[in-house]
Curated annotation (Swiss-Prot):
The keyword Plastid applies. Signal peptide: none annotated. The gene is RBCS. It is found in: Plastid, Chloroplast. This is Ribulose bisphosphate carboxylase small subunit, chloroplastic. RuBisCO catalyzes two reactions: the carboxylation of D-ribulose 1,5-bisphosphate, the primary event in carbon dioxide fixation, as well as the oxidative fragmentation of the pentose substrate. Both reactions occur simultaneously and in competition at the same active site. Although the small subunit is not catalytic it is essential for maximal activity. GO terms for biological process: photorespiration; reductive pentose-phosphate cycle. Residues 1-28 form a transit peptide. It comes from Chlamydomonas moewusii (Chlamydomonas eugametos). Gene3D superfamilies: Ribulose bisphosphate carboxylase, small subunit (3.30.190.10).
Amino acid sequence: MASIAAKSVSLRAATRRAAPVAAPADARFKVWQPVNNKQYETFSYLPPLTNQKIGRQVDYIINNGWTPCLEFADPSTSFVSNANAVRLQGVSAGYYDNRYWTMWKLPMFGCTDPSQVLREVSACQVAFPNVYIRLVAFDNVKQVQCMGFLVQRPRNAAEYCPLEKRSV
């Protein structure tokens, strides 16, 4: 009986109320801007990544044993929409064409240094300055894409909101 009482005392101690959290300075509720605010992949909500930040992500990719790969797409076909998607019926449920971007060269198998990837990003930017470019990581054992993020938005991208205009 004494052990049951000891257990109930320890349960009471674990259910104490947490201290109240202070409200942020700007406590107004905001709404996400639904017009011209397309987001791509993982880090789209952040400002554009610098080469140093891209390099850190490549380190993460390499340390996990994944293969980095660059892909690019024209703004008109980079995002699946009713205007540019070809819906294939009967082949597989829910399949939409235009989900896949053009690959820049081959996947970088055996890549061990972020500078190798950054050189390829730079070469792709020179060759295609007005396209979206994303870096994706593939796990060749599981045969899946594990990660993907934009490394370039077109300079004239109209479907993108700056950070300060994303919420109203």
